């Protein structure tokens, strides 16, 4: 973050938009922090500096962060990620603590890329290289210059950033990527290398140059030249078309040889710096980001490669705090919200945010869905509702006057909506609302919780409440589990019920994790109508090893269990084996589920259940009950004892 005055990208961290973003510079307005800053601050959102049509080139959110030395309301970076892949320009990435800024931009490939540059500067990326990387990603042609600026500011790889700038000018995206590489190299020479690459036109080549000292040479026209420095190799590869530079000097020979390498963005994987080159070539901004990170960055870059923009941000993070920003949204960087950085909102960006948003969307999507992962040090709200305004913590509350009072803000965009505090020509939906992740899935997480101004008291939180207590219907997930069980149970044809219908046997299922047990329980409910399941509960602690103090008899552990009541012991044995075989092959928490058979000598008198009246109004919510609890023909037996 050296002071670099307003910075170079299209946006000058003050919130102004310079009109990079389109006709109605939708938000700008000077120092007023709301806008520019979270942008500059790191949470850049891709939107140009503040508002900006989503697609606008916008200076990425990474512009120098108010270079007057004061970090405006230090908004914990929580960049929602460079939207890269989907969504507008995706510049924002910068978020990461330090360097993040740069990386993010790159990923976004933000229109101008310039943004990336700015971000880099600001970030100064802990890694330093990060800054450059960002620019590279976004660099795409125009942005290049910006990239340079950022790098300089970052001071990150020394001249590395500058190198990036050069790359941008020359070949656009690739060039930028190269720059990132330079950052990684950090060596002054590295920076130069990047510049050279740009000249060549093989932006990727530039990246190679970045490689450590060798960079100088490598960056130069020849991807191979990059060989000089390990990172250089990568860059060189890029130039060749083979981000492969993977092998340091090898770059030229190995990845370089294959144009494919670069495209893949795999190059990034190969060797940090290489990654950068590769990313650029591919267009996988992420790759670039990685390069900046140097070694660390690479990992991030990889994710980016997948998702694209987000990844870049991550790369920066690699270097330092940036990670969070990088994660940006999703699992990988891709921008989904996935679990990780890329996805989008997901579990935590590259290292940065580990949040728990529910990522709910399964799969990559885990990306955004997970909810805006709460960032470092941001505890999740304690109570489901209460927090009327946003489930954030005090520091992130917008200044009182400035909060538009209408539209709910989509969680996760926290207050970065509408810098002017009102509809300023933007759609009424905060920029991130759309990619919010699967709407169909209410689970957990602030998302359905309190909306900005409360949502009319319609509901408190998503989840299964709503269905009758203790009753869940089926859903694809549970159906799949049930299917697996049915197949395994098909092996044992034994009586599952008895005439007297006494619940004398049971299967005690425990361990694994709460979620894995819960899912298994729902699956069993679907697969075996003849059983009755208790809700999940917790086991007490057993003995403390050694002579010391023992736990109190009531002390609950976090290990859960549930009991399956059955009418025949023989079926209990069969079910136990089926469950064992079902969970064993599965990955971690699930395979640790333990099962044992129990027998209740006098039987357990489960309370009788009377089917709801069909015609009466009373049936209103109850008639669904037999979906999973009843109607299987053995009802009569329950009350018979």
UniProtKB/Swiss-Prot annotation:
Residues 40-67 are annotated as: Chromosome-tethering GR1. Residues 379-386 are annotated as: Nuclear localization signal. The record marks 491, 581 as: Interaction dimer-dimer. The record marks 518 as: Required for episome maintenance. The keyword Heme does not apply. Keywords: Activator, Covalent protein-DNA linkage, DNA-binding, Endonuclease, Host nucleus, Host-virus interaction, Hydrolase, Inhibition of host NF-kappa-B by virus, Nuclease, Phosphoprotein, Transcription, Transcription regulation, Viral latency, Viral latency initiation and maintenance. It is found in: Host nucleus. The modification Phosphoserine is found at residues 385, 393. Phosphorylation at Ser-385 increases the nuclear import efficiency of EBNA1. Phosphorylation at Ser-393 is required for interaction with CSNK2B. Residues 358-381 have a biased composition (Basic and acidic residues). Residues 436-450 are annotated as: Interaction with host USP7. Residues 65-89 are annotated as: UR1. GO terms for biological process: positive regulation of DNA-templated transcription; regulation of DNA replication; symbiont-mediated suppression of host NF-kappaB cascade; viral latency. Residues 1-124, 234-475, 612-641 are annotated as: Disordered. Pfam families: EBV-NA1. Coiled coil: none annotated. It is an enzyme of class 3 (hydrolase). Residues 41-50 have a biased composition (Basic residues). The keyword Transcription regulation applies. Residues 40-60, 325-376 are annotated as: Interaction with host C1QBP/P32. Responsible for the origin of replication (oriP) dependent replication and maintenance of viral episomes during latent infection. EBNA1 dimer interacts with the DS (dyad symmetry) element within the origin of replication oriP and with a host mitotic chromosome to initiate viral DNA replication during latency. EBNA1 binding to DS recruits the host origin recognition complex (ORC). Governs the faithful mitotic segregation of the viral episomes by binding both the FR (family of repeats) element within oriP and the host mitotic chromosomes. Homodimer. Dimers can assemble into higher-order oligomers like a homohexamer. Binding to the DS element involves 2 dimers of EBNA1. Interacts with human USP7; this interaction is independent and simultaneous to EBNA1 interaction with CSNK2B as well as necessary for PML nuclear bodies disruption by EBNA1. Interacts with host CSNK2B (via KSSR motif); the interaction requires phosphorylation of EBNA1, is independent and simultaneous to EBNA1 interaction with USP7 as well as necessary for PML nuclear bodies disruption by EBNA1. EBNA1, USP7 and CSNK2B form a ternary complex. EBNA1 is possibly linked to multiple sclerosis in the host. Antibodies that recognize both EBNA1 and the host protein HEPACAM/GlialCAM can be produced when B cells undergo somatic hypermutations. A mimicry has also been proposed between ANO2 (Anoctamin 2) and EBNA1. This is Epstein-Barr nuclear antigen 1. It comes from Epstein-Barr virus (strain AG876) (HHV-4).
